A protein has these predicted regions:
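A short acidic, leucine-rich amphipathic alpha-helix
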Residues: 24-26
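Alpha-helical oligomerization segments
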Residues: 194-201
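Short gly/ser-rich loop at a beta-strand->alpha-helix junction or flexible surface loop bordering the NTP-binding
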Residues: 4-6, 14-22, 31-148, 159-187, ...
């Protein structure tokens, strides 16, 4: 192997990142040629252009999603993006977040990712939506920033998902998380819509769900 001296560095990067990017590898001094050589020799596999994983390492059904998220800031390591001070506002949301959180009956893909700035992508499996997500509105799942349950429920409504499906998702979230905060959910509606519209959407959702009709 022409670039055998990089094998240990690739293994180290894989150990810390799982799925890793070409730009992350470059920060560790691993050139593109070494990655190409590692693919050809069967040591690593390409998930998509610019993203790899070590062959033989534990793969996950979310590896493609992880790769897509990492490629939104390809040179940053995961631990850097997890820091509160470094929050870039890019989060997994909507139907994809619901799937990851284990609530409702939504599919993981097509992937829905919220970003503070518009991102144009040719990836038909991903829908980037311009939306502001605060750092305290997310949780991390396997290193991925995923909108919290309350935010996810709100975004499903904002994304015009079927209200009955969103109501079922709310039921699941309310049952699964004893700390689920209805007031927090209500505030998300209040922050986006005018008072009359916010009240209508929120109360319609509650009425469609199994949650006490007296809650408002």
């Amino acid at each position: 192997m022409k670039h055998s001296k990089y094998i240990s560095s690739i293994a180290e990067l894989s150990e810390s990142e799982g799925v890793f990017t070409t730009a992350q590898a470059a920060r560790m001094g691993i050139p593109r040629d070494a990655l190409h050589d590692a693919v050809e020799s069967g040591r690593i596999e390409r998930i998509m252009h610019g993203a790899y994983r070590l062959v033989g390492s534990r793969s996950s059904y979310i590896d493609e999603l992880v790769a897509i998220w990492k490629l939104t800031a390809p040179s940053k390591f995961t631990h850097e993006r997890m820091q509160v001070s470094s929050w870039d506002g890019i989060a997994i949301g909507g139907s994809t977040a619901a799937s990851l959180l284990g609530i409702g009956d939504f599919y993981l893909s097509p992937y829905r990712i919220y970003t503070p700035k518009r991102i144009n992508s040719r990836n038909t499996a991903t829908k980037f939506t311009k939306r502001d997500i605060a750092r305290d509105e997310i949780t991390f799942i396997d290193g991925l920033p995923v909108t919290c349950m309350e935010r996810t429920i709100f975004d499903l409504v904002a994304d015009a998902e079927d209200l009955s499906l969103v109501a079922d998702t709310l039921n699941d979230a309310y049952d699964k998380d004893k700390q689920f905060d209805l007031a927090k959910l209500r505030n998300f509606f209040n922050s986006k819509y005018k008072e009359k519209r916010a009240t209508y959407l929120y109360e319609s959702l509650l009425l469609e769900s199994d949650i006490s009709k007296g809650v408002s």
